[in-house]
């Protein structure tokens, strides 16, 4: 076994990512029973913090969270936070730290005072049960019908009777012979006046005679109050059923909602007054449970995190609201054979009428840039901020439901809510993603929720391994007598230096094992690694090889170590296709901004390849070879279009840490390629590369399509028939292909070559 020591001098660096990690998992143990213990611990660990003020103490399913805010010399609150999190036994578990370096000149974070307003509120009385008529969750989902209607006037849309549901046992208040929409959880109010709000119509208090039901339809304005009241009450009861009750209760007083609170096509949770004000422009928002529950999602955010502000919190809040609404629509349809538009948020309010605004819960092209702050409803580098957070959550919920059925809803919703507990001012998506994966592992260690979440967050670039090994070429060639050249790179992509690094590498097929150790690996370090390795006599040309790596490091010497595994796959020998490669050296134009408003014109490169007659049909041995270079692969989408017009995406804005990539895409390692089975090979094939982010350009070096006829495993260019090789590609493990760009490890002797990665900041 070789032992390789990385020296600090060999790993020169620049900062790769601008965003620092706010989550800290201390090595030391401490018992914290109350706010005084928490404050004493913080001041002992961070003596330079100065004066801290306790904002609040919150309890969640897994422990207690003490939220502190920094203050300046005048006692005014500053932007920043430190949250001390303990487990259920009061043992220190984690810190969230976004404290400013200096509070003398800090940016103030003053609480917003309640704006002047007047409300009409229902009276107190006796709690009784009533019957209501509602949309559950909306008329399109309830019926599975489009119901597009007349775009000019939504009031003319014909709603079938089957769109309405009768619900019973709903708690309301009885007073003086009438029933009002108020109970211990929800209060339907009427905003009569409010500063800085374009208030909606004054509908008064909705009530019915004792013994009657709230049986309205959408032609009655009272239906809006009833529908919103029901869905908000149902969701609040669901929170309690998940375990957020007693000392863990998120809401301790009735939540106020005005179903016609705004005269615009917009709804808002007013944080200063604690009121949900629903809009009436276009389709009245209260008719769509998605919109009601989305706004309720904002209220949940502020109850879980008292200083929900700064960083990516705006976009996270929008994404969580979409998720919370989508999860309920999914639950309503859980027993249906055919589910209606699961991946669409607001598919009633956002679809019908002249004012359309629906969002996707399945934006697989959304990618995260840690150097940017994500606001609400904005596009960053081609990614809508709301969808960037909702997509990994909702798609993991679908994955969980497919495996565990109805039980997955409660379990996964607990994970999502618990993940937010303990966050603080200035949280970034990668902070919350890490916390959510952590919550999944702690709540359900026997189920793969954490693994699934981790994979989806990595797909979107929200989570990234701080230390990765990457290969620029997936094929191992023969470089000398019984020798192959392994060329890889060790990349430190974190925002700060890593301590006590150890990488255990193993490639069993080559009888090779190494351990790489370093006390310090600086941020942004890229170390090129090359080694000639002997080829065992038993190795067959065309065989698939795996390189496994176990990685361990600490963010600093006072934190718990991070441990994870990576894997790379190689092919021994270069695959030979039935059709010759096209060597194009075609430039990939950079995207460019074309006006003052930040509108982006995509950069596009098209390369055609003609396959002559007699080439046969696409079969299971079909492959696409591609070699291209680009400083930032996350800018690129690479698609191949067959002569029939059917297309397959090879790279989809996925991050890749090296500037060059040569790979062979096969049925086994590329999702979607099997859709081309049976297609004629003859005709024009088109490679299309799209760049959606300004700042970098690249080049297509070569590409080709065809059946794999053999593997070139010699210096003379002879090839081996794939039918004679001993080991073939494993179709059960397509995620291990290097085309994923995720990177596993392979490292041999160290011939250091340092690449400086300059930090960048782009603004849209």
Residue ranges of model-derived segments:
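Disulfide-bonded cysteine-rich modules in secreted/extracellular proteins
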Residues: 469-471, 582, 743
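Juxtamembrane/start-of-transmembrane alpha-helix segments at the extracytoplasmic/lumenal side
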Residues: 738-747
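Loop and turn regions of beta-sandwich accessory domains that flank beta-strands and are enriched
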Residues: 463, 538-540, 569-737
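A cross-kingdom C-terminal cell-surface attachment/processing module
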Residues: 746-764
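Gram-negative bacterial Sec-dependent N-terminal signal peptides
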Residues: 1-17, 754-755
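Zymogen propeptides/activation segments of proteases
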Residues: 18-292, 299-320, 326-574
């Amino acid at each position: 076994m070789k032992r390789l020591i990385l020296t600090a001098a060999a790993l020169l660096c620049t900062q790769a990512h601008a965003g620092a990690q706010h989550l800290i998992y201390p090595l030391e143990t401490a018992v914290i029973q109350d706010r005084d213990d928490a404050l004493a611990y913080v001041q002992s660990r961070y003596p330079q913090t100065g004066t801290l003020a306790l904002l609040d103490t919150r309890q969640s399913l897994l422990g207690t969270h003490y939220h502190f805010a920094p203050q300046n010399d005048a006692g005014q609150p500053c932007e920043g936070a430190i949250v001390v999190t303990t487990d259920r036994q009061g043992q220190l578990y984690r810190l969230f730290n976004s404290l400013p370096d200096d509070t003398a000149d800090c940016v103030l974070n003053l609480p917003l005072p309640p704006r002047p307003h007047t409300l009409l509120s229902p009276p107190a009385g006796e709690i009784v049960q009533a019957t209501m008529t509602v949309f559950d969750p909306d008329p399109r989902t309830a019926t599975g019908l489009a119901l597009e209607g007349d775009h000019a006037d939504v009031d003319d849309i014909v709603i079938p009777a089957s769109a309405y549901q009768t619900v019973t046992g709903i708690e309301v208040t009885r007073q003086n012979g009438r029933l009002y929409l108020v109970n211990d959880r929800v209060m339907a109010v009427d905003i009569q006046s409010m500063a800085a709000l374009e208030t909606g119509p004054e509908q008064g208090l909705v009530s019915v005679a004792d013994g009657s039901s709230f049986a309205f339809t959408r032609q009655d304005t009272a239906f809006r109050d009833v529908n919103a009241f029901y869905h908000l009450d149902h969701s609040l009861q669901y929170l309690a059923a998940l375990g957020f009750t007693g000392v863990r209760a998120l809401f301790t007083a009735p939540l106020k909602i005005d179903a016609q609170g705004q005269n615009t096509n917009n709804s808002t949770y007013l944080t200063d007054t604690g009121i949900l004000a629903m809009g009436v422009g276009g389709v009245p928002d209260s008719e769509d449970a998605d919109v009601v529950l989305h706004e309720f999602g904002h209220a949940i955010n502020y109850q879980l995190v008292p200083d929900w502000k700064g960083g990516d919190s705006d976009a996270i809040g929008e994404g969580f609201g979409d998720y919370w609404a989508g999860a309920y629509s999914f639950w309503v349809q859980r027993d249906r054979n055919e589910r209606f538009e699961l991946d669409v948020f607001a598919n009633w309010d956002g679809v019908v009428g002249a004012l359309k605004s629906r969002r996707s819960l399945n934006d697989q092209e959304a990618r995260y840039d840690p150097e940017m702050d994500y606001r609400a409803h904005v596009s960053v580098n081609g990614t809508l901020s709301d969808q960037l957070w909702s997509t990994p959550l909702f798609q993991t919920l679908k994955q969980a439901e497919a495996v565990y059925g109805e039980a997955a809803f409660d379990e996964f919703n607990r994970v999502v809510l618990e993940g937010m507990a303990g966050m603080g001012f200035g949280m970034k998506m990668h902070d919350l993603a890490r916390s959510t994966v952590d919550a999944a592992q702690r709540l359900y260690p026997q189920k793969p929720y954490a693994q699934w979440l981790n994979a989806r967050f990595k797909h979107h670039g929200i989570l990234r391994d701080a230390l990765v090994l990457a290969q620029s070429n997936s094929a191992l060639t023969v470089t000398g007598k019984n020798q192959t050249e392994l060329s890889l790179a060790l990349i430190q992509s974190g925002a700060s230096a890593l301590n006590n690094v150890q990488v255990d590498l193993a490639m069993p097929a080559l009888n090779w094992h190494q351990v790489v150790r370093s006390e310090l690996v600086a941020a942004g370090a890229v170390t090129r690694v090359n080694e000639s390795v002997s080829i065992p006599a038993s190795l067959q040309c065309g065989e698939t090889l795996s390189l496994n790596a176990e990685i361990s490091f600490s963010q600093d010497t006072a934190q718990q170590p991070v441990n994870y595994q990576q894997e790379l796959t190689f092919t021994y020998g270069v695959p030979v296709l039935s059709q010759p490669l096209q060597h194009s050296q075609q430039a990939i134009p950079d995207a460019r901004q074309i006006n003052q408003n930040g509108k982006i014109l995509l950069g596009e490169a098209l390369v055609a390849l003609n396959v002559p007659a007699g080439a046969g049909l696409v079969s299971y041995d079909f492959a696409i070879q591609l070699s291209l270079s680009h400083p930032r692969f996350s800018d690129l989408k690479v698609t191949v279009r067959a002569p029939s017009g059917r297309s397959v995406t090879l790279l989809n804005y996925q991050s890749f840490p090296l500037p060059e990539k040569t790979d062979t895409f096969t049925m086994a390692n590329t999702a979607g390629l099997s859709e081309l089975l049976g297609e004629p090979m003859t005709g024009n094939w088109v490679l299309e590369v799209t760049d959606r982010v300004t700042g970098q350009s690249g080049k297509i070096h070569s590409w080709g399509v065809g059946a794999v006829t053999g593997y070139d495993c010699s210096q003379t260019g002879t090839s081996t028939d794939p039918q004679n090789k001993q080991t073939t590609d494993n179709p059960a493990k397509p995620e291990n292909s290097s085309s994923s760009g995720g990177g596993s490890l392979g490292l041999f002797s160290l011939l250091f070559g340092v690449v400086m990665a300059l930090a960048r900041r782009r603004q849209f």
